[in-house]
Amino acid sequence: MFPTGWRPKLSESIAASRMLWQPMAAVAVVQIGLLWFSPPVWGQDMVSPPPPIADEPLTVNTGIYLIECYSLDDKAETFKVNAFLSLSWKDRRLAFDPVRSGVRVKTYEPEAIWIPEIRFVNVENARDADVVDISVSPDGTVQYLERFSARVLSPLDFRRYPFDSQTLHIYLIVRSVDTRNIVLAVDLEKVGKNDDVFLTGWDIESFTAVVKPANFALEDRLESKLDYQLRISRQYFSYIPNIILPMLFILFISWTAFWSTSYEANVTLVVSTLIAHIAFNILVETNLPKTPYMTYTGAIIFMIYLFYFVAVIEVTVQHYLKVESQPARAASITRASRIAFPVVFLLANIILAFLFFGF
């Protein structure tokens, strides 16, 4: 039934398999035991934060150096930034003797040591970061440098548009179980910007950092927070000849009706200039920021509409008085309108400037 000599060959194969697998099983048991009882090799996600020195919190000094800032979107209230992020802190576990080591500075990979978990609060999605350098001094001071790019969300205030100034914020926090463990500080020597940093249509005034004294709760954990502020002001000169002056010229043309005696001509003039103003306003509206509050430009546009409304009433009253055989009274109202409209318009603009700019 079976080939001759089959049973002895099967027995020999089983014996050979036992001789092969028994040593391998023993090695596996030893390796599992070493992994179970040996201390872990700490990496960035495994090393616990260094303990406070002399019952003081661990201070992480931060700095952001702007390389470029671009694509400021008024409607989305976002901007893009390309910059360096520098961190420094002391970890005594990394201290070494430069004489014995033969080096004055040691370099590490990000996975080899503990690194504070710095997060950008108002960044859309996650920042794109490339670690440039991680170096450690003999006393354990760690210098961390990365280059990053991000799209940042920052609320804008358009109340004074187009004469507005804005503060663009970049918020940093550090994750910590207890605020006594890790706090953020500003390294002023590492805060700055390139001289050629610019934003189209804006003047960059300053770039500073502010430490927020009050921590806030996030996911039942307290955070330490920094606020990097980029102060900018809008280049408003182009808005004057392109938006403001055309609206004023159209309005002033309608006032020539106060020097005409023809009712039909006056009505045609006022209504046609009103239509021109509406058409121009629709064209300008596409470039104006959409806000739930009144802006300075919006207030001027609304005020101009009011003057058109009053001008139509004046022309109608003037014609009514003439029909009712009161030409003298109609003429006096017309003469008064020639002075009253410009004066009231000037006073209204002064009031608006005071309300929006606090002069």
From Swiss-Prot:
<keyword id="KW-0675">Receptor</keyword>
<keyword id="KW-1133">Transmembrane helix</keyword>
<keyword id="KW-1003">Cell membrane</keyword>
<dbReference type="InterPro" id="IPR006028">
    <property type="entry name" value="GABAA/Glycine_rcpt"/>
</dbReference>
<keyword id="KW-0732">Signal</keyword>
<comment type="similarity">
    <text>Belongs to the ligand-gated ion channel (TC 1.A.9) family.</text>
</comment>
<comment type="function">
    <text>Cationic channel with similar permeabilities for Na(+) and K(+), that is activated by an increase of the proton concentration on the extracellular side. Displays no permeability for chloride ions. Shows slow kinetics of activation, no desensitization and a single channel conductance of 8 pS. Might contribute to adaptation to external pH change.</text>
</comment>
<feature type="topological domain" description="Cytoplasmic">
    <location>
        <begin position="259"/>
        <end position="261"/>
    </location>
</feature>
<keyword id="KW-0633">Potassium transport</keyword>
<dbReference type="InterPro" id="IPR006202">
    <property type="entry name" value="Neur_chan_lig-bd"/>
</dbReference>
<dbReference type="GO" id="GO:0005886">
    <property type="term" value="C:plasma membrane"/>
</dbReference>
<protein>
    <recommendedName>
        <fullName>Proton-gated ion channel</fullName>
    </recommendedName>
</protein>
<feature type="signal peptide">
    <location>
        <begin position="1"/>
        <end position="43"/>
    </location>
</feature>
<feature type="transmembrane region" description="Helical">
    <location>
        <begin position="262"/>
        <end position="286"/>
    </location>
</feature>
<feature type="transmembrane region" description="Helical">
    <location>
        <begin position="327"/>
        <end position="359"/>
    </location>
</feature>
<dbReference type="GO" id="GO:0005272">
    <property type="term" value="F:sodium channel activity"/>
</dbReference>
<keyword id="KW-0894">Sodium channel</keyword>
<dbReference type="InterPro" id="IPR006201">
    <property type="entry name" value="Neur_channel"/>
</dbReference>
<dbReference type="GO" id="GO:0005230">
    <property type="term" value="F:extracellular ligand-gated monoatomic ion channel activity"/>
</dbReference>
<keyword id="KW-0407">Ion channel</keyword>
<keyword id="KW-0812">Transmembrane</keyword>
<keyword id="KW-0739">Sodium transport</keyword>
<feature type="topological domain" description="Periplasmic">
    <location>
        <begin position="287"/>
        <end position="294"/>
    </location>
</feature>
<dbReference type="InterPro" id="IPR036719">
    <property type="entry name" value="Neuro-gated_channel_TM_sf"/>
</dbReference>
<keyword id="KW-1071">Ligand-gated ion channel</keyword>
<dbReference type="InterPro" id="IPR036734">
    <property type="entry name" value="Neur_chan_lig-bd_sf"/>
</dbReference>
<keyword id="KW-0630">Potassium</keyword>
<comment type="subunit">
    <text>Homopentamer.</text>
</comment>
<dbReference type="GO" id="GO:0004888">
    <property type="term" value="F:transmembrane signaling receptor activity"/>
</dbReference>
<dbReference type="Pfam" id="PF02931">
    <property type="entry name" value="Neur_chan_LBD"/>
</dbReference>
<dbReference type="GO" id="GO:0005267">
    <property type="term" value="F:potassium channel activity"/>
</dbReference>
<dbReference type="GO" id="GO:0042802">
    <property type="term" value="F:identical protein binding"/>
</dbReference>
<keyword id="KW-0406">Ion transport</keyword>
<feature type="topological domain" description="Cytoplasmic">
    <location>
        <begin position="324"/>
        <end position="326"/>
    </location>
</feature>
<keyword id="KW-0472">Membrane</keyword>
<feature type="transmembrane region" description="Helical">
    <location>
        <begin position="295"/>
        <end position="323"/>
    </location>
</feature>
<dbReference type="InterPro" id="IPR038050">
    <property type="entry name" value="Neuro_actylchol_rec"/>
</dbReference>
<keyword id="KW-0915">Sodium</keyword>
<feature type="topological domain" description="Periplasmic">
    <location>
        <begin position="44"/>
        <end position="235"/>
    </location>
</feature>
<keyword id="KW-0997">Cell inner membrane</keyword>
<keyword id="KW-0631">Potassium channel</keyword>
<feature type="transmembrane region" description="Helical">
    <location>
        <begin position="236"/>
        <end position="258"/>
    </location>
</feature>
